[in-house]
């Protein structure tokens, strides 16, 4: 069976309350599907209504989407693989599978409180995550999301949800977390949730060798000065991030997307750079504090789980290098459906 695309919609409540990591980790590990792309959305009332119309088999979900306030920030994950829609739907659950003990993601991350009166009307319904029931619903929803992705998605702004001034910072979830479908990428996001920052940008990508050279260019002189094999060490960093050493590439190959998957995240809030760096931990996992990303997920100075920008200036430099503002969400969907 050929690969197909499906999607999962992480609701505004789940996104705001830091449930994204747990949802993502369980969805990827249980399904074995590839995280193809993703995007943060602030959907309009029209987009929410159009999406609701694709969930005819889930009336509670359809009503929930219609009732969401416009511009409520949410996260869409696009998954790829054999029989993707059916696999994701069985793991996410639906309107009828929210009363169990963790069999589905809705059991764990959603809530349904029904009246004890005859008829059992829903008093409170928060699904946490929504997924189409089949391939046809998936294609219909993906087309709507792709068409709206420029105007209603991207790197958003959550400053109105904070009482203090805010800043944005960049995180890269490194390739060591994607060796096989696992809970690791979600675990990294889960540990960052303790910062209380808003997740306002999300983009899976493959770093090219040329991007790696520019991204890690500032450390080359330091490594060459301090280590006899400094340039070789620098090339190893790029090979880890992009899949190939610069010296192994012809000039024309350097700009091609690399073989190693990464996910770029943008967090926003007061003192975002410092808070994320604290949650990240020391570059050397052996020296990192307990409960940090690098202590939990790192093994060496290079293979250490994640990268985070160390200054506002580097946030701008690094997001520019990896072209985070470019919208490949719609092109990946167009190529896959």
Predicted regions and their residues:
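Non-catalytic terminal and connector segments of soluble metabolic enzymes
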Residues: 1-337
